[in-house]
Amino acid sequence: MSETNHPSRRSAMLQLAAGAAALNTTSAAAQSAASAPADSARLQKELSNWGRWGAADQMGAVNLITPEKRKAAVRLVREGASFSMARNAEIKEAVDNPAPIVRKTTRVGKGQQPGSAGIGGTSDTFFISYHGYAHTHMDTICHFLYEGKMYNGYSQDEVTEDGAAKNSIINFKNGIITRGVLMDMARHKGVDYLEPGTPIYPEDLDAWEKKARVKIGAGDVILVRTGRWARRDAKGPWPVSDGLAGLHVSCAKWMHARDVAILGGDDAQDVLPSRVDGVSQPVHTLALVAMGMPIFDNLDLELIGRESDRRKRWEFLVTASPAAVPGATGSVLNPIATF
């Protein structure tokens, strides 16, 4: 999400809640209160996957997507119907998108190529600053840091102006192929969308599992729909500083217990404000740094929400392939769901 060079991001986990590790067992009312800064190292250590797949690992929780997991996910395909979960690249500046894509046609189709016997052609170029709250993208596991370290203990010095020498997006160039599970929190609450600032707690995720009759398992991609884009369509864009619905920090422990491989959603994943004093994105930090769990941000889950609801099927094959850019901290993404 937002750049980790910002001081509040680089030191995000320094002030996690003293009781955060036990939040899964507390009530939503107790969880919703802002937590006091303390004991962040304990939670970072408790949810850590560092060394789990070896000292040289740069794949993190994606290691949980085994060959058997991929084959099982492919067997979910019954119809061959596929649906994109990417939002069309935003071309207009808005209060929630200060950096729209810049695209320019460099050659139009008029005329012919010299010596080409009537053959013409077109070309264009585009630039996109994908991290943030607008464009659909994948955060890789060098994107956030905690106390000068990224996932698996690699130093922040591994990321320079020349790119990331460790944990970059290039490690995922073979693609993501696994089971995806839509966790439609808006439908669960019986609304078109959750209001900004609405937290999602572990008990909400548990309740959705029961309702959907799907149990989250090792190697899954979970896709959390808040209805953000439905609200934007209905009411127009709003500043991110006004809040976003999303996961409370207590959900990090829930995901770790189930060995989730990748977290995705239609917003920034973290509820904003975060309800953790002094820490703006604790879910991001725990997922990326402690668990080595990549994140799919700003997905458009409206279509897949309707298609899943129509079928009453909330699990499907997910395929996604980031751009193979050595040293990159993430990538634009077009994840596909196939029934």
Question: Each PLM stretch: what is its role?
Answer:
Residues 21-22, 56:
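A generic secondary-structure boundary signal that marks alpha-helix termini
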Residues 2-20:
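N-terminal secretory signal peptides and thylakoid transit peptides that target proteins
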Residues 6, 31-339:
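Active-/binding-site microenvironments in catalytic and ligand-binding cores
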